[in-house]
Amino acid sequence: MVVMTIIAIMAGAVYPSVASSLDGIRLTSSADDVVAFLNGAVERANRRQVAVELTVDPTAGTFVVHSTEAEFERHFELPQNIAIQAILPELVGGAADPKQVRRFYIYPGGTVPRVGVLLAGKNGAQRLVRVDPITGAPKIERRQGAVQ
């Protein structure tokens, strides 16, 4: 009986840190998936020499890529516990609804738009997935606190 009590106390003390670690792993994994999706959109535009439209819907937590090629469409949906907190750059004036659908266009051989998506987990951790307009490569930044 004493052993069961000790195990119960230890499980109660360890559970929050394990749950927090799992949330962090889910957030990192989701950020990696978004990077791969964005990289695929940039590569498609450059390799196929077609314009690509990237649509980000923060309310639904989805990313959609359309191309000028017939019947090409790719979807990516974030897991339930990961949310899109902000889409960068903010619109001019900053008065727009932060939950509105945003569209970015990627042209072959052109400059990649400076797209940034701030992902947030339940525990408050954040990852900023940003496309570098010079190299066209997406990268992940760890964030704490407000959008800068």
Name these PLM-found stretches.
Residues 1-5:
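N-terminal signal-anchor/signal peptide hydrophobic helix marking the start
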Residues 9, 13-36, 43, 47, ...:
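N-terminal helix-rich module
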